Amino acid sequence: MKTQIVILFISMIMLQMFVQIEGGFWGSLWEGVKSVVGKRGLRNLDDLDDLDLDHLFDSDVSDADLRLLKQMFR
C-alpha cells in the first residue's frame, strides 16, 4: 500500500510539472489563434493586404553594401 501511494504521489508531481511546462506553450498558441481569428485580427490582416510589401520591407541596398556582402561571402 505504501508503494502505491508513493507511486501515485510521484506521478502526480510529474503530471503537474508537465502541465505547467505545456501550459505556456498552449497559452501562446491560443493567443496566436485568437489574434488571427478575432475581428481585430482579421481586420489587421486585411489592412496588411492593402499595403504594398515594398513599403514593409525596405530593400535599399547601396553599392557599398553590395561590395561588403561580396567580400564577406568570398
UniProtKB/Swiss-Prot annotation:
Residues 41-74 form a propeptide. Residues 1-23 form the signal peptide. One of its GO terms (biological process) is defense response to bacterium. The keyword Membrane applies. Expressed by the venom gland. Keywords: Amidation, Antibiotic, Antimicrobial, Cleavage on pair of basic residues, Cytolysis, Hemolysis, Membrane, Secreted, Signal, Target cell membrane, Target membrane, Transmembrane. It is found in: Secreted; Target cell membrane. One of its GO terms (cellular component) is membrane. Is highly capable of inhibiting antibiotic-resistant pathogen growth, including methicillin-resistant S.aureus. In vivo, shows high antimicrobial activity on a S.aureus-infected mouse model. Antimicrobial peptide that is rapidly bactericidal against Gram-positive bacteria (MIC=12.5 ug/ml against S.aureus, and MIC=100 ug/ml against M.luteus). Is also active against clinical antibiotics-resistant bacterial strains. This is Amphipathic peptide CT1.
